[in-house]
């Protein structure tokens, strides 16, 4: 699960401009679980230039996204919600380790998030008359 972000030894990468990358800093930030203080994973410590690039890329992506018709946006959001539902157990497992949530609470939060994404997509379609 999540092989696109996870490398060996629970070392994660950042998604910038559609690509999974490591930081040129070659430094990592260790993430520990509040339960048992065990290592959950490591995330790249990004350089200032990499943070600036991530922000610039997000702004450019927003320009493209705003031109996507509402129906297409809703379709994409529904797909994202469906993926959350499909992967609820895997995501809950990560949440349990990373932030110490119990399984029931983690799964409930994921399912509520999926519902809210769908609600938001439906609201946007109704507001635009599509």
Which residues does each predicted region cover?
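Terminal low-complexity tails and localization/encapsulation signals of metabolic enzymes
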Residues: 1-42, 75, 127-130
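Glycine-rich loop-to-alpha-helix module at the N-terminal edge of alpha/beta enzyme cores
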Residues: 38-127
